[in-house]
A protein has these predicted regions:
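Generic beta-strand/beta-sheet core signal
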Residues: 104-106, 121-122, 155, 211-213, ...
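Primarily recognizes the serine-hydrolase "nucleophile elbow" in alpha/beta-hydrolase
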Residues: 195-257, 510-581
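Alpha/beta-hydrolase-fold serine-hydrolase catalytic core, especially in secreted/extracellular enzymes
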Residues: 16-98, 276-441, 449-469, 476-517, ...
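Loop/turn elements at helix/coil->beta-strand transitions in domains of secreted/extracellular proteins
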Residues: 114-117, 148-151, 204-207, 228-232, ...
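Alpha-helix capping and helix-loop boundary segments enriched in small/acidic/polar residues
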Residues: 130-137, 174-188, 210-221, 251-264, ...
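Cap/lid segment of the alpha/beta-hydrolase catalytic domain
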Residues: 110-199, 238-249, 443-513, 552-561
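Sec-dependent N-terminal signal peptides
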Residues: 3-12
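Catalytic-domain carbohydrate-binding cleft regions of carbohydrate-active enzymes
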Residues: 207-250, 254, 258-301, 306, ...
Length: 582
């Protein structure tokens, strides 16, 4: 597998236009071996962290954050043991959609300021949040944390236990347009789980943490990356440079374009984090590779002591030895108790499944939605939210992150006669074209068949007759830029932009190369839609001529003519028209 250096490419100091377009040759997937990028200053890292946070939120359909509605918490079925209690929980994380879980609380009086609290997502274990084996036990970790003085909410992955209004794996191209997928719902559930803990009496809102293993660790470090309320964490057996997650709930389009889990995990810095790893899974290199990279980020904050690692000779797990390391780490950083002997795991009473399941002999509340109803509710709420936004910079940011498009500060080029090739330094892309100099306002003409077809068009003939300078390009996968692109890797769109999103980028790159504030953008045929969205996200006004040919922004229009995941959630056609002045 091709190793990605510095996340993407290492080019010579003197940047040159590459011979091949890296978007066709360097195609990462969940099993690619990534190499962490080095950051020299805290400011450089903080800028990257801000960008990644918005990218993650956009990929999850949470940019902007949906309006939070009342959780209507139902807490019932209390079980009391000698020093802790367990209760069943249902909370309404979206109108008509319910997340199930169990709430574990200490029976001793709350200290001044309240108990610290922990959200406890689970991995892909057979019994979900009720898994209790030597390899992993969610009840054991929750009960022992409660005994140590934490309030713990162990909640379901989508499609597990009591959270059954969607399957665990769902969605397709239409849902992708609206950024509605298992990761979206699960991520949102995690945010609302923190809201739930904050709302409880006796909880210290300033001391909330998270821990989970495997898929639960993915939820843990993603939540910590975007929610600063997570003050301490222990993602177990997941942060890796060689495997990024194999389940739908860990992947969404755009989530890891130009990034990967080590960088996302480092976003926890400088808050305390324990990295648990094992020789028998994809975290086998943690002591020598992933941990040093993340510790280097902590060192930028002068907080290298806030991140630790435990590496076991074991298979994929969250076993007792790992859990005890987590108890000790949390004890030292949260409880102020550095005595490891205080954090030995004690045996637990295993409750009957029916005594733990919120929906045992119980139905979902009235008004609970079907899957189709939930998707319709998501779409309706997204439309209402985005249509109310009139701030142009907010809309432009939303569309830019859906497209993952940027206006390059520098564009390099090489020319031979009227043939030109453009590229963004250190990105490895290529934009071939035809450049005909002239006088007056420059024009960029984009045709779906490429530059040669544009050269023969009436639009270009008219421009040349007027003596104007004209650039015609082979946008990504058009004209001479057509090339094999292997899309067979796992979760292709999680790691790679779609062809249409790349075409928008090529248009922006070309406009930036022209360096003409009044350059006109002309889109022919299907390329008119590409040009509309490029003009919409450009940081300056772009005169646009584009006959959209009946494109109205319906879902089917995007599926047929402009497939970009998340584009509808980001405001879609109406936002683009507003920004482009069409």
């Amino acid at each position: 597998m091709r190793r990605l250096l510095a996340l993407l490419f290492c080019l010579p100091a003197l940047a040159q236009v590459p011979a091949e377009d890296s978007r066709n040759t360097t195609i990462p997937n969940t099993d690619t071996h990534f190499t962490p990028r080095a950051y020299k200053t805290l400011g450089e890292w903080e800028a990257r962290r801000t960008h990644l946070r918005k990218q993650i939120l956009s990929a999850a359909g949470l940019l902007p954050m949906p309006v939070k509605t009342d959780l209507h918490p139902q807490i019932f079925g209390r079980i009391e043991n000698s020093d802790y209690s367990i209760e069943k929980v249902l909370i309404e994380t979206l109108p008509g959609y319910y997340l199930g879980g169990n709430l574990y609380r200490p029976l001793k009086p709350a200290p001044a300021g309240g108990f610290p609290a922990v959200v406890s997502p689970h991995g892909h274990w057979n019994y979900g949040r009720l898994e209790h084996t030597t390899v992993a036990s969610i009840p054991a970790r929750a009960i022992n944390l409660a005994r140590q003085g934490y309030v713990v909410f162990a909640y379901d992955q989508v499609g597990y236990n009591d959270t059954i209004q969607t399957p665990h794996d769902f969605g397709g191209p239409k849902e992708d347009l609206w950024a509605f997928n298992p990761l979206t719902v699960q991520f949102w559930n995690g945010i609302r789980a923190v809201d739930f803990l904050e709302s409880l009496p006796g909880v210290n809102r300033n001391k909330i943490g998270a821990t989970g293993a495997s898929g639960g660790a993915t939820q843990t470090f993603l939540l910590a990356a975007v929610d600063d309320r997570i003050q301490f964490s222990a993602p177990a057996n997941m942060i890796s440079a060689i495997m990024q997650g194999g389940a739908e709930c860990e992947n969404a389009p755009n989530l890891r374009v130009d990034t990967f889990n080590v960088e996302i995990g480092a976003m926890m810095a400088p808050r305390p984090m324990l990295m648990v790893s094992a020789t028998g899974d994809w975290t086998k290199n943690t002591p020598s590779e992933e941990f040093p990279a993340i510790r280097a980020i902590y060192a930028l904050y002068d907080k290298a002591a806030n991140v630790e690692t435990l590496h076991l000779d074991a298979p994929h797990n969250y076993n007792q030895q790992n859990r005890e390391a987590m108890y000790r780490f949390f004890g030292a950083h949260v409880l102020g108790d550095g005595d490891a002997t205080h954090f030995k795991e004690r045996s637990i009473r295993v409750e009957k499944l029916q005594d733990m399941l919120a929906l045992h002999n119980r139905t979902l509340p009235a008004g609970a939605l079907t899957f189709d109803g939930l998707f319709a509710e998501w779409v309706q709420r997204a439309k209402a939210q985005t249509s109310a936004i009139r701030d142009r910079s907010t809309l432009r940011e939303m569309l830019s992150y859906a497209l993952l498009a940027d206006w390059p500060a520098e564009v390099i080029s090489q020319a031979a006669g009227d043939q030109v090739v453009l590229s963004r330094p250190e990105r490895g892309d290529r934009v071939p074209g035809i450049w005909i100099p002239g006088k007056g306002a420059a024009a960029l003409v984009v045709a779906p068949e490429g530059a040669a077809a544009a050269r023969k068009s009436p639009e270009v003939a008219q421009l040349l007759a007027a003596g104007r300078p004209v650039l015609m390009i082979d946008a990504f996968q058009t004209g001479t830029a057509v090339a094999p692109r292997d899309r067979s890797g796992k979760f292709f769109t999680t790691f790679n932009k779609t062809d249409d999103a790349n075409r928008v980028q090529d248009i922006l790159t070309s406009l930036a190369w022209l360096k003409a504030p009044n350059a006109e953008l002309i889109g022919i045929g299907k390329a008119a839609v590409w040009c509309l969205f490029a003009a919409a996200v450009a940081p300056r006004p772009v005169p646009l001529k584009a006959d959209l040919g009946g494109f109205t922004g319906a879902d089917q229009d995007y599926l047929d003519r402009f497939f970009v995941p998340g584009i509808q959630r980001a405001g879609g056609f109406e936002a683009a028209r507003l920004l482009a002045g069409k």
